[in-house]
Every structure is written in structure tokens, then in C-alpha cells.
């Protein structure tokens, strides 16, 4: 689960929040 949190942070750092679910960053 911790790795998912790190991945989520990395995704939000490179992707706009609006596209959070569009890129499957969860």
C-alpha cells in the first residue's frame, strides 16, 4: 500500500489533478 501512495504522489507531480483518474494514477 505504501508503494501505491508513492506512485500516486509521483503521478500527481507529473499529471494535472484533472487527469488524475484519466491516467489511472491511483
From Swiss-Prot:
Q: Which GO terms describe its molecular function?
A: phospholipase A2 activity
Q: Which residues form a coiled coil?
A: none
Q: Would you tell me the protein name for this molecule?
A: Phospholipase A2 homolog A1
Which GO cellular component terms, listed alphabetically, does the Swiss-Prot or TrEMBL entry include? extracellular region
Listed A to Z, the keywords are: Disulfide bond, Secreted
Source species, please? Micrurus pyrrhocryptus (Coral snake)
The main location is secreted
Is Disulfide bond among this UniProt entry's keywords?
yes
How would you describe the post-translational modification of this protein?
Contains 7 disulfide bonds.
Q: Does the keyword Disulfide bond apply?
A: yes
Q: Where in the cell is it found?
A: Secreted
Q: Which family does it belong to?
A: Belongs to the phospholipase A2 family. Group I subfamily.
Top-level lineage group = Eukaryota
Q: Where are the transmembrane segments?
A: none
Q: Name one GO biological process term.
A: phospholipid metabolic process
Q: In which tissues is it expressed?
A: Expressed by the venom gland.
